[in-house]
């Protein structure tokens, strides 16, 4: 297959591993920055065109004939990245996470609503409108409080407010900056640890426990967190797969936290990093992603052939 990966930083570990796994499996892979793409729609054939400008100095070139797409763009490229994904989806080219699913996962409040609608346990959470006063908001959540911007990854945009007044001040400041924030209960008994489950299709293929360090409450790799192998219960594996399905994702990093009342889903990541979890688990996740994409491509080919056969009868 000729594969396309949408990624702004091709030198990142995850992108390099996926390219390596694809090429070792006999595929060709291009890596393109979605922000350097021009999408063209035309009544004339071809109806969907992708034109790419590698640098400011390069002449734009038309790109054709990709068989499947892997999205790996960050939160700052979500809008254009999803527009490129839809361009391929409209041509029945399989994508390893659809644009719709990507957008749902990237909106933290919407994803929590969708998880709750499927009966999946999450921390108590609040989202107040811009005219709802911050002191009144804090009447409905206990301190300490976690405050999260509605988008962001790698622990960025997540704040721990130890006291009620601190939370009020932060909410008021962010409101002035026109930044929407959700408030969430702090799971103190987790002691700065959470679980990352890497889901592909209907299986948890790898997992790890992340542990915060040096007084930092966030356990993310990019915040200095450490990782260790962990055994998940069958209920936790089922929860991770159910959360992935709830958002319509093929591939996801599902973050769980063990609370006194049971395990909860913190959030679902549509473009989870590979480095920390591959090195901790010893599992070749990149290869499993390529294998899953091969199966998705073949399934779509079979459906297309069936439709063509029926149309000729």
From Swiss-Prot:
Cofactor note: Binds 2 magnesium or manganese ions per subunit.
GO MF annotations in UniProt: ATP binding; metal ion binding; ribosomal S6-glutamic acid ligase activity
InterPro entries in the cross-refs: ATP-grasp, ATP-grasp_RimK-type, ATP_grasp_subdomain_1, RimK, Rimk_N, Rp_bS6_RimK/Lys_biosynth_LsyX
UniProt binding sites for Mn(2+) 2: 267, 269
Gene3D superfamilies: 3.40.50.20, ATP-grasp fold, A domain, ATP-grasp fold, B domain
List of residues binding ATP: 148, 185-186, 194, 218-220
Keyword RNA-binding applies: no
Requisite cofactors: Mg(2+); Mn(2+)
Binding-site residues for Mg(2+) 2, renumbered to this chain: 267, 269
Binding-site positions, Mn(2+) 1: 255, 267
Residue span(s) of domain ATP-grasp: 112-294
Biological processes per GO annotation: protein modification process; SOS response; translation
Keywords of this entry: ATP-binding, Ligase, Magnesium, Manganese, Metal-binding, Nucleotide-binding, Protein biosynthesis
Source domain of life: Bacteria
EC number: 6.3.2.-
Binding site for Mg(2+) 1: 255, 267
Pfam families: RimK, Rimk_N
Any GO CC annotation of this UniProt entry: cytoplasm
Family per similarity comment: Belongs to the RimK family.
NCBIfam families the record matches: rimK_fam
UniProt protein name: Probable alpha-L-glutamate ligase
Native source species: Pasteurella multocida (strain Pm70)
């Amino acid at each position: 297959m000729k594969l396309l990966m949408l990624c702004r930083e091709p030198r990142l570990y995850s992108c390099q591993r996926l390219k390596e796994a694809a090429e070792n499996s006999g595929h060709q892979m291009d890596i393109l920055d979605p922000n350097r793409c021009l999408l063209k729609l035309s009544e004339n054939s071809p109806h969907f065109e992708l034109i790419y400008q590698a640098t400011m100095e390069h002449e734009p070139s038309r790109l054709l004939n990709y068989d499947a797409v892997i999205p790996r763009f960050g939160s700052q490229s979500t809008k254009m990245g999803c527009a490129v994904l839809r361009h391929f989806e409209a041509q029945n080219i399989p994508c390893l996470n659809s644009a719709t699913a990507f957008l749902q996962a990237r909106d933290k409040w919407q994803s929590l609503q969708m998880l709750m609608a499927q009966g999946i346990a999450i921390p108590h959470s609040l989202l107040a409108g811009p005219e709802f006063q911050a002191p009144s908001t804090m009447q409905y959540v206990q301190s300490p409080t976690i405050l999260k911007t509605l988008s962001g990854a790698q622990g960025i945009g997540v704040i721990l407010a130890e006291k009620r007044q601190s939370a009020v001040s932060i909410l008021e400041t962010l409101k002035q900056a026109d930044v929407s924030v959700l408030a969430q209960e702090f799971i103190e008994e987790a002691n700065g640890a959470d679980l990352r489950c890497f889901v592909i299709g209907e299986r948890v293929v790898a997992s790890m426990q992340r542990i915060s360090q040096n007084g930092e409450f966030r356990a993310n790799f990019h915040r200095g967190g450490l990782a260790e192998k962990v055994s998940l219960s069958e209920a936790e594996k089922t929860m991770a797969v159910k959360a992935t399905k709830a958002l319509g994702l093929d591939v996801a990093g599902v973050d769980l936290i063990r609370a006194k009342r049971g395990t909860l889903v913190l959030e679902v990541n549509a473009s989870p990093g590979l480095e920390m979890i591959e090195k901790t688990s010893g599992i070749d996740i990149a290869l499993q992603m390529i294998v899953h994409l091969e199966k998705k491509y073949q399934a779509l080919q079979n459906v297309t052939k069936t439709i063509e056969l029926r149309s000729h009868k």
